[in-house]
Amino acid sequence: MWDYTDKVLELFYDPKNQGVIEENGEPGVKVATGEVGSIACGDALRLHIKVEVESDKIVDSRFQTFGCTSAIASSSALTEMIKGLTLDEALKVSNKDIADYLGGLPEAKMHCSVMGQEALEAAIYNYRGIPLAAHDEDDEGALVCTCFGVSENKVRRIVIENDLTDAEQVTNYIKAGGGCGSCLAKIDDIIKDVKENKAATNLNNKGGSKPTNIPNSGQKRPLTNVQKIALIQKVLDEEVRPVLIADGGDVELYDVDGDIVKVVLQGACGSCSSSTATLKIAIESRLRDRINPSLVVEAV
C-alpha cells in the first residue's frame, strides 16, 4: 500500500477540474489541449487549457486521465496551480512543484508528476502553434528503453533536473527500465556520465583559486624529479584539494615515478563510485594543464 499524503487522497476522492473544455467560439479566449502517455502503457493524460488571448493568461484548466491515484491527484493539482498564470509562467512549473503541492509523492509514482509537466508543455506549444517535434528534443537521439519508447536525451534530462542517482529512480520518474529491464545498464551508464560532467563543471566553477603560477624561465631543460614533485604538490594544494575538501573528500600525493603520479584519495573521494572521474577530470587534467601533458595519475 502506497503512503499517500492527505492532499493526494483529497484530490483523488474529490478531484477538481476533471473534464473537458470545449471550444465554443467565446470571444477573446482560445482553448488548447496537450496529451501525453498511452493507455496501452497504463498511464495517459489529456490536459485542456483556456487562455485569454489579450493577457496570455490561463483562465481555466481541466483534465482527463487514465491512471492511478497519483495520476489523478497530480493532474488535479496541476490544473489548480496554473490558473491565473501567464503561459510563460506556467512553463516554469516543474514536476517537483507538482509533487510539492501535493505534499510529496511516493518515489515510485513520480512519473505522474512528470506526465503533468509534459502535458502542460504540450498544451502551451499547441496553443502557440508550434509543432511538438520542434521543441521536443527528448525524442531525438538513441532510443534507450524500447518498452516505453524513452530516448537517451529524455533519460539524461530527467537525471539532471531531479538529481537522480540510480536506474531505479529513473524508472520511477519516466518508467524507462520498467519493462524487460535490458536497458538498466545503459541507464546506469548515462547517470555515471552525468555525474562525471557535473564533477568537471564543479571543478571549473569552484576551481576557485587562481591558476597556480608555475615559474617559466624559458629554458628547455626538463624538470628534475624534485622540481616536478614540488610543482605537483603546489597544484594539488592550491587548485585541487580545496575543491575536493568542499565536497567532503581530499587527496594526498604518495609518489612520483617518472610521469606516473601516485595519489591517495581520502574521505568521500575514496569511497565514491565516481573516483575514476575524480582522478581523470579533477586531478589528472589539471596537472597536465599546469605542468606536463604526459602526466598520468593513479590511485594507490
Curated annotation (Swiss-Prot):
<dbReference type="Pfam" id="PF04324">
    <property type="entry name" value="Fer2_BFD"/>
</dbReference>
<feature type="binding site">
    <location>
        <position position="147"/>
    </location>
    <ligand>
        <name>[2Fe-2S] cluster</name>
    </ligand>
</feature>
<feature type="binding site">
    <location>
        <position position="180"/>
    </location>
    <ligand>
        <name>[2Fe-2S] cluster</name>
    </ligand>
</feature>
<dbReference type="GO" id="GO:0005506">
    <property type="term" value="F:iron ion binding"/>
</dbReference>
<dbReference type="InterPro" id="IPR041854">
    <property type="entry name" value="BFD-like_2Fe2S-bd_dom_sf"/>
</dbReference>
<comment type="function">
    <text>May be involved in the formation or repair of [Fe-S] clusters present in iron-sulfur proteins.</text>
</comment>
<keyword id="KW-0535">Nitrogen fixation</keyword>
<dbReference type="InterPro" id="IPR016217">
    <property type="entry name" value="N_fixation_NifU"/>
</dbReference>
<feature type="region of interest" description="Disordered">
    <location>
        <begin position="201"/>
        <end position="220"/>
    </location>
</feature>
<feature type="binding site">
    <location>
        <position position="183"/>
    </location>
    <ligand>
        <name>[2Fe-2S] cluster</name>
    </ligand>
</feature>
<keyword id="KW-0411">Iron-sulfur</keyword>
<feature type="binding site">
    <location>
        <position position="145"/>
    </location>
    <ligand>
        <name>[2Fe-2S] cluster</name>
    </ligand>
</feature>
<comment type="similarity">
    <text>Belongs to the NifU family.</text>
</comment>
<dbReference type="InterPro" id="IPR001075">
    <property type="entry name" value="NIF_FeS_clus_asmbl_NifU_C"/>
</dbReference>
<keyword id="KW-0408">Iron</keyword>
<protein>
    <recommendedName>
        <fullName>Nitrogen fixation protein NifU</fullName>
    </recommendedName>
</protein>
<dbReference type="InterPro" id="IPR034904">
    <property type="entry name" value="FSCA_dom_sf"/>
</dbReference>
<dbReference type="GO" id="GO:0016226">
    <property type="term" value="P:iron-sulfur cluster assembly"/>
</dbReference>
<dbReference type="GO" id="GO:0009399">
    <property type="term" value="P:nitrogen fixation"/>
</dbReference>
<dbReference type="Pfam" id="PF01106">
    <property type="entry name" value="NifU"/>
</dbReference>
<dbReference type="InterPro" id="IPR010238">
    <property type="entry name" value="NIF_FeS_clus_asmbl_NifU"/>
</dbReference>
<keyword id="KW-0479">Metal-binding</keyword>
<dbReference type="Pfam" id="PF01592">
    <property type="entry name" value="NifU_N"/>
</dbReference>
<dbReference type="GO" id="GO:0051537">
    <property type="term" value="F:2 iron, 2 sulfur cluster binding"/>
</dbReference>
<keyword id="KW-0001">2Fe-2S</keyword>
<dbReference type="InterPro" id="IPR007419">
    <property type="entry name" value="BFD-like_2Fe2S-bd_dom"/>
</dbReference>
<dbReference type="InterPro" id="IPR002871">
    <property type="entry name" value="NIF_FeS_clus_asmbl_NifU_N"/>
</dbReference>
